[in-house]
Amino acid sequence: MITETEHASLPPGVEVITTLPEAAARIPAGAEARTIRVTLPPGDPGAPPHRHPGPLFGYVTQGEILFELEGQPPRILKAGDALFEPGGDVIHYQGANNLPDEQSQLVVTMFALPGTPVLTVVSAEELVERRHLRVTQPG
């Protein structure tokens, strides 16, 4: 974890956006890091509900993303906002472009075992089984 002392020693123009000390434990042994750029056209709903094989860290570089993970209320991420997904069993419900007239974009780095798919779509049956874990209204 980066301490306040370490923050003070950063050169001008360098900023720590997010520190997640609990995230390292979720990275599978033998994982590779994949950096992925996601570009969503205006109003694009993004991928259907899905899972990722491991944790990912990301940053919105352009526009606004409607972002929803299982157990968390949906929220709007704007350019400059960071995000974290634990991966594994957690369902990623929404990653939509919240803007009707501009593209939105994010860059993520995912940690996953070599050869695993970037995402796996969740079946309709499982969505019904896990609906009690979804938080659809802001807290």
Feature map (PLM): residue ranges:
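Glycine- and acidic-residue-biased ligand/ion/polar-headgroup-sensing regions
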Residues: 53-71, 81-82
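Short histidine-centered beta-strand/loop micro-motifs
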Residues: 46-51, 69, 76, 95-98
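A short beta-loop-beta micro-motif enriched in histidine and acidic residues
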Residues: 30-31, 43-60
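Extracytoplasmic low-complexity repetitive segments enriched in small/polar residues
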Residues: 23, 27, 41, 66, ...
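A short, N-terminal "cap"/entry segment at the start of jelly-roll beta-barrel domains
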Residues: 1-34, 76, 120-139
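Ligand-binding loop in jelly-roll beta-barrel domains
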Residues: 73-74, 87-117
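Short, solvent-exposed loop/turn elements at domain surfaces
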Residues: 46-49, 116-120
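Short acidic-glycine-tyrosine-enriched beta hairpin
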Residues: 25-32, 37-41, 70-89
